[in-house]
Amino acid sequence: MGPASFPRAARLCLPTEFSRVFQNGARSSDACFVVLACKGGAGGARLGITVARKAVAGAAGRTRIKRAVRESFRLNRERLPATDIVVQARSAAAKRLNAELRASLDWHWQEVIKRCKDS
């Protein structure tokens, strides 16, 4: 796979992986997303996404947000340090255009780079 792919090894899948990030992660937030990141293994950046039904009511809206997050992560994964990242969508994300979601995520990726590079 190419450098901009999103293989299974780049995903957080297990509840214990999510719990570790929730307990130890550096937090970055804005109107659309809460992003938690903590130092991961040597395998590069890994992503977990949570979009609660309470935050985004329709399944189509939740899917759109998850696709936007995955696409942004996929394009920026090579720049990110070896971190485990969890992105939580807020209800405001459902009302935003995809371009606004991308801009928000780009800002969060910069925050992750700043906060996790030296730790």
Language model regions located:
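Positively charged, solvent-exposed patches that mediate nucleic-acid binding
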Residues: M1-S119
